[in-house]
Amino acid sequence: MTTVKFKYKGEEKQVDISKIKKVWRVGKMISFTYDEGGGKTGRGAVSEKDAPKELLQMLEKQKK
């Protein structure tokens, strides 16, 4: 499976693309929420140029 690597509050993280719930664009950044498990929702962002193509495809699907 594809993973998204990002920094959140100075901490390096990575999340499996299948856990991502919602994706949106903020300028040249792609922001997203994901399921952390235990009923928690995590947040992350990655630059458009560093985003995996699967994340960009999710963004396009949500626009429709």
Curated annotation (Swiss-Prot):
Subcellular location: Cytoplasm
Chief localization: cytoplasm
Lineage: Archaea, Thermoproteota, Thermoprotei, Sulfolobales, Sulfolobaceae
Keyword rRNA-binding: no
Keywords recorded for this protein, A-Z: Cytoplasm, DNA-binding
Temperature dependence, free-text field: Hyperthermostable.
Signal peptide boundaries: none
Domain of life: Archaea
Summary of the function given for this chain in its UniProt record: Can constrain negative DNA supercoils. May be involved in maintaining the integrity of the genome at high temperature.
Any one Pfam family match given in the protein's UniProt record, by short name: 7kD_DNA_binding
pH effect summary: Highly stable from pH 0 to pH 12.
InterPro entries: Chromo-like_dom_sf (IPR016197), DNA-bd_7a-e_arc (IPR003212)
The protein, known as: DNA-binding protein 7a
